[in-house]
Amino acid sequence: MERITVTLGERSYPITIAAGLFNDPASFLPLKAGDQAMLVTNETLAPLYLDKIRHLLEQAGVNVDSVILPDGEQYKSLAVLETVFTALLQKPHGRDTTLLALGGGVVGDLTGFAAASYQRGVRFIQIPTTLLSQVDSSVGGKTAVNHPLGKNMIGAFYQPASVVVDLDCLNTLPQRELASGLAEVIKYGIILDGEFFSWLEDNMDALLNLDGKALAYCIRRCCELKAEVVAADERETGLRALLNLGHTFGHAIEAEMGYGNWLHGEAVAAGMVMAARTSERLGQFKQEETQRIITLLERAGLPVTGPREMSSHAYLPHMMRDKKVLAGEMRLVLPLAIGKSEVRGGVPHDVVLGAIADCQQA
């Protein structure tokens, strides 16, 4: 069992990583006998895990209700958020309830925002079931829903009480979802840890084959890196923005193509190549390092070009609505070397458009 702490003073919390955590009620601390909880999941995961976790917690004396959401990025919306509030109010659940987010990034982000908002804030626990949510979205307290004009535009910073990562969940994860998560894994190597990137080059086959030892190390390392960044910059005023490598381009793809048509990790993968090409055009990133990124993404089964039907100019309106925009100026996360990156403003639009075009034609 691996345990990492996200250090935020009185709001610090553990990330527990192991196989078989869904068999032990202690995994879900600080829940205890007599507590009330609302388990939020989706229609894909409910048949796999809902009854098991509910029975486990009820055996431990926790009173558990549940709400089952439709599955897909297009349901990360205010309308679906309202169904969670309705379920909480119908019982009713008070301020002493705990929300349990059992699912991937959509369930985790939406449930976290519900917890931040319901009666001005209730406790919640992240139970991520996808690789992407285990290494990224469940850690750090970013919660949100989408708006038709932009991804994650309505949300709050709100930290969970704990994060429970059961490695067994990955055994039921579709290959496309596994690859999507690997995009965020590769991102950590590019922006923060060149040695980890090299490890990924050596161990990608093991990860794709769900080797338990490789997965445990990979998830632990990603969570360590994320925890360090969040502890230093919880509200994304500086360092934490580096975690958005590829996301400014990627969010444009998701919004333009319709949420759910490109998985988040797929869009981020293409976006990271666009960021690398931008950095190349600025003379601060080597072409051979871009090729290393492309090769690793392709080995993971990820796209390295944008959608053919999306022109370069279609990206800019979405990118100008990005949350990193300041005083009307686009700011991009750009790699400087494998393991080192920066946030840079003032990149000429023609450079950005050229980099996107490079990726469309690759």
From Swiss-Prot:
Keywords, alphabetical: Amino-acid biosynthesis, Aromatic amino acid biosynthesis, Cobalt, Cytoplasm, Lyase, Metal-binding, NAD, Nucleotide-binding, Zinc
SUPFAM superfamilies: Dehydroquinate synthase-like
Positions contributing to NAD(+) binding: 71-76, 105-109, 129-130, 142, 151, 169-172
Obligatory cofactor(s): Co(2+); Zn(2+); NAD(+)
Pfam families: DHQ_synthase, DHQS_C
Protein EC: 4.2.3.4
GO BP field: amino acid biosynthetic process; aromatic amino acid family biosynthetic process; chorismate biosynthetic process
Statement: the UniProt record of this protein carries the keyword Nucleotide-binding: yes
Alphabetized InterPro entries for the sequence: Dehydroquinate_synthase (IPR050071), DHQ_synth_AroB (IPR016037), DHQ_synth_fam (IPR030963), DHQS/DOIS_N (IPR030960), DHQS_C (IPR056179)
GO molecular function, a single term: 3-dehydroquinate synthase activity
Catalytic reaction(s) noted: 7-phospho-2-dehydro-3-deoxy-D-arabino-heptonate = 3-dehydroquinate + phosphate
Assigned protein family: Belongs to the sugar phosphate cyclases superfamily. Dehydroquinate synthase family.
Function of the molecule: Catalyzes the conversion of 3-deoxy-D-arabino-heptulosonate 7-phosphate (DAHP) to dehydroquinate (DHQ).
Record NCBIfam families: aroB (TIGR01357)
Protein name: 3-dehydroquinate synthase
Originating organism: Enterobacter sp. (strain 638)
The organism's taxonomic lineage, starting at the top: Bacteria, Pseudomonadati, Pseudomonadota, Gammaproteobacteria, Enterobacterales
Gene name in the database record: aroB
